[in-house]
Amino acid sequence: MAEPESEKPSSAQGGGLPSSDHPLNPILQRQIELPEIKINYFSLFRYATVKEYALLLISAFFAAVSGAMFPLLILFIGNLVQVLKDFNLGTIPQEQLSEQIRDIALYIVYLFLGQLVSVFIFTNGCLLVGEAITNAIREKYVRSLFRQNIAFFDTYGSGKITSQLTSSTATIQDAISHKIGLFVSACSCFVASYAIGFVKHWKLTFILTSTVVAITGVMIIMSGFMAKFGANSSGALAEASAKLEETFSGIRVVKALGLEKRLSDELDPQLLNIEFWGKRVRHVMGWMLAIMYGLIFLNYGLAIWQGYRFMQGGTEDVGAIITVLMCLNIGAFLFGNVGPHLQAMSLGAAAAQDIFAVIERESVTDGGAPPGSFEVEGNIEFRNVSHVYPSRPDTHVLQDFSMIFPAGKVTAIVGASGSGKSTIVSILERFYEPVSGQVFLDGHDITHLNVQWLRQQFGLVGQEPVLFNGSIFKNVAYGLKGTQYGQESREVTMKLVTEACRIANAHDFITALPHGYDQEVGIRGASLSGGQRQRIAIARAIVSGPKILLLDEATSALDVQSEEAVQLGLNMASSGRTTIVVAHSLSTIKLADNIIVMEKGRVAQQGTHAELEAQEGLYQTFVRRQQLKQATLEPPHARITPAVDTPASPQHRLSEKTGSIYGQGESEAADKSPSTKYSFVQLVKFVARFNKEDWRLMVTGIASAVISGAVWPAHSVFFAKAIVALSSPSPASLARGPNFWAAMYVMLAFVQIASQGVQGSAFAICAERLILRARRVAFKYLLRQDVEFFDDPLHSSGIMTSFVSSDVNALAGLSGVFLGTLFSATATVLGGLILSLAVGWKLTLVTMGTIPIIIVAGYVRLKLVGTLEKISRKVHEESAGRVCEEINAVRTVAASCLEDEMCEDYVRSLKSKEKTYLRATLWSSGWYALSEAVPLGCMSLGFWYGATLVMRTEYTTEQFFIVVTAVIFGASSAGLVFAFAPDFGKAGVSAERLQELVDRQPEVDTWSEEGDHIETTNGKVDVSNVVFYYNQRSKTPVLNSISLGAAPGQSIGLCGGSGSGKSTVASLLERFYNPSSGTVSLDEKDVRTININSYRAQFALVNQEPLLFSCSIRENLLYGSLGKDLTDSEIEEACKMAQVYDFVCSLPEGLDTSFGSNAVMLSGGQRQRLSIARAILRKPRVLILDEATSALDSTSERAVIEALTKTAEGRTTIMVAHRLSTIQGCDKIFYLRAGAVAEEGTHEELMAKRGSYYDSVNLQSLG
């Protein structure tokens, strides 16, 4: 559809744009630029509804209530300290002490119940709000994408879209769901602590505020760095995702060229760039937490030292001092835990930057004009139209083009590749805005018309047919969207669909399929042949009876019988309609009312077929070059045997051996009970292997984490000693008074900063290296898989891109912050347990009994989160994969006005998991609330029983506080580990999928060294009695006992109806698949006995739909070199042979010119010729051309055929073709029907037989 481009901007805003002083810059810039917007954390809530805001406020309220529980607990602890001091001094009797202890314990029980309820409500509410708002962002993003002009997508790749719909939105959701509740709870704790502190002792509270100011400053500074580094990391990930999506989309080309290792190596610098920025984010995070915890311990020292001074002045008692000390420090402690939450929030804001920029971008074609109010006649006028593409501002694709297309007439456009033919259609459809000139429809400037209404007046069939995953009926019915028939019943719609399919010559093959019109076509129509897809696309274009038909190589993928039948149908459909036909095959336009011959963006000739044929000029040359060598021809007659259509492309044949890495069975079953093939221990061992080389860093990190965790039991001792010292009648007389313990806290602070900082840095490096290696493994093992693996809809390019970029990233949940927290918490629990047992075993045994409850509750929640993560990720990846598929076909979506339909499909997929998500969230929140509330119950029990032991004089006050403090921090640490349950659950799911991928053994394994290694071959190819099923459960074979062959150096042609098995033979020869039975042999050796890599090195394949990669022309061509260094002269010679040399020389940077994803701004012919040049550089012994010249104009086709004929000397050549002029010079031609050879012979022999081949030649005659 599109015309040449030379360079691809690196983003939607840069790269290949003209310089700022270029006169066309504003016109081109506005077609692709993204608005510059400023995003902060609160911007993430801009799409929340009133209901969601209400639920968020309720959740925030209960989060605040939850946060206030600990300061209230400290208030009671302070009262208990004062009561115990009074009891020790003899100022209150034992009975009063017992009564006050009971009251305090009962109040703490109330706090336990309040915590249980409040945590459940805020957790559940935050998770639901986060899911709802993120889904709203996803929906807005997808709707905005489908609103954009087509030029925007030429620089904004589908890989980036996939990454943003999966990885980036997951980051946003993480920032606005549970994390916000935890953040509010921590802030509430902080505020409540200060409120109590100011009430109890405002002077001491004010002094201790200095430390909190320092903590806040550290958080602000460090968060700024994290946001900056996080944005760089997200940008690097988006670039890598684009490369991944491009690779998986062209997996057949990758396999045919043997590019697996090369592409892995090329991706590595981008993965290293992601690791570079990721490590910086985690380094900053680790040291921020270390400094914050160090400041907390300094605060303890300051409080003890200053509190003692106040006590010396007689201004306050020890209870108030301890209350202020513990309140401010527990507030600062929990506030210090917001570090990971702030990191998540800053990463969420960074991830939203590009997403919100797309959402807020106004398309240059989406002016919002009301639908047209006039009756369309179909008069079209181009007036002085000039056009350039943003990446080539110095090259005019159209130059001052003026032309009238009369209403009700058929106008054909022909010309060489890149002459501007398809650009005319693109501008008429408003895919691009011309840089000058105007286009009128019935006298109305089309830029003033509503773009959707305008496109509804057209029926467009593109050169490369695009179908969407769904039934045939649904695909054809898409053509009715937005028209007067769009809301009709299925019965009425079916009649319209059936009639359109009859005209498009598709009805017979559709009814022959197992499910008829309800047959699923698969991703991109994978279950149908190219010709079948083309006919369905034609039916979709004409089903609504549009006023104007735009046919851009509409019959290029059809066999000759189908082409003739469809052409007759199109002639019928064109009656009374304005029809514009872009064509290379001149046999399809002989009856046009006017034929325009384009050359370099200008009109070179125009007239009828007869007039132009009689004139000396380009058209006459085209006709002469397409003329077939013929015997005496007769008109086609009843002897013509229609092609028998069978599904001719793969639709996943999965068995246990070749199963999906996304599990077995139907999605509903998977939703109910996601299968787990591996135990937790197996997965941990598997993930640990990625950090095997980092064992020294791991040991350093673990040792530092143990020291960091052991600080808290030491803190318990220091704290108890300080309380005893402050409670003493004469603290100054003590050998180790309050000042000594204040100094010990200064020492403890520096130990904590050093140990936690080293821990954070060590695990930061380990986590990012783990992700780097896991991504490398994931990509390499995916490239190892055979083509059959990628035929599975669950392994689409979008889903696999998400797997490498997003899923694998989740493995950090088993490393980094989580690993540090796990070892630190373990050291705290074990250290506290040992200390407590040594100091007071009775109280320890009673209070420690609650920790197993925390662990069980956390474990159950972990399992629930894992289940929820599997369901949620499956839905999001599949829906993102569909969007990616649709964006790749955005021209078809836009031309058919399917934007709203595609958006609604996406929204329905998001809503499909709402009930499951709600149920899992309720259970998960309940168990999490229990794990958070149990420590308060533990404290209640501990204070009651411990105080009772003190009252009985079995324990001293020092023993009591050492044990209780150690147990409190032990229980809190145990609960803190399970706060990472969501991250841990994601990591578990990702580890399982990666393990399944690594364990999967492909049937055709490019890693295998087995088989004979061959340096060269004679090129003798044989297919003997081959039967082949794309689907193991299919009853109809695609190839049915077929036998054919080619002698060394011989050229053979394969022709026949769509679905007859031509391309399947090519796929078997390339060993994309193994035959179900029979033998494919090379030099009389079964190809399965030859090493796959050395086998494919003897072959070169040029596909019907050419694929080029996002790099320079030189790099694209060198992909065919088998790793050999080639000189420029060798490359240029290949370009000359492929008739693309002149075009390359016309580009600003020649061979070093880069272009966008799949070279979308090159014409189909230019892409095809570059693909042929790449094949020539491969110097193959066997050359496979699967419709290799289908996209070429007649001049280029004839030149390329001559070049291929020359290069084929001494090589075996297999040519698959619909256009018989391509294969008439072959040594032997095989005409296929229903997967078997119906006729064979030379062109002359087959013409003499007057069979199906003879009839096909008749149908393509230009005479």
Swiss-Prot record:
Glycan-modified residues: N232, N384, N469
Checking SUPFAM superfamilies in the record gives:
ABC transporter transmembrane region, P-loop containing nucleoside triphosphate hydrolases
GO process terms (BP): oligopeptide export from mitochondrion
UniProt binding sites for ATP: 415-422, 1056-1063
**Has keyword Transmembrane helix?**
yes
Keywords noted in UniProt: ATP-binding, Cell membrane, Glycoprotein, Membrane, Nucleotide-binding, Repeat, Translocase, Transmembrane, Transmembrane helix, Transport, Virulence
Q: Write one Gene Ontology MF term.
A: ATP hydrolysis activity
Q: Give the ABC transmembrane type-1 domain ranges.
A: 57-347, 699-986
Q: Where are the transmembrane segments?
A: 57-77, 104-124, 179-199, 206-226, 284-304, 318-338, 699-719, 740-760, 817-839, 843-865, 930-950, 960-980
User: Where found in the cell?
Assistant: Cell membrane
Chain residue ranges for the region called Disordered: 1-21, 635-672
Give the record's membrane topology: Multi-pass membrane protein
KO phenotype (gene knockout): Leads to increased expression of sirP and subsequent production of sirodesmin, as well as to a higher ratio of deacetyl sirodesmin.
Reactions accelerated catalytically = ATP + H2O + xenobioticSide 1 = ADP + phosphate + xenobioticSide 2
Q: What name does the UniProt record give this protein? A: Multidrug resistance protein sirA
Query: What organism does this protein naturally occur in?
Result: Leptosphaeria maculans (Blackleg fungus)
Which gene produces this protein?
A: sirA
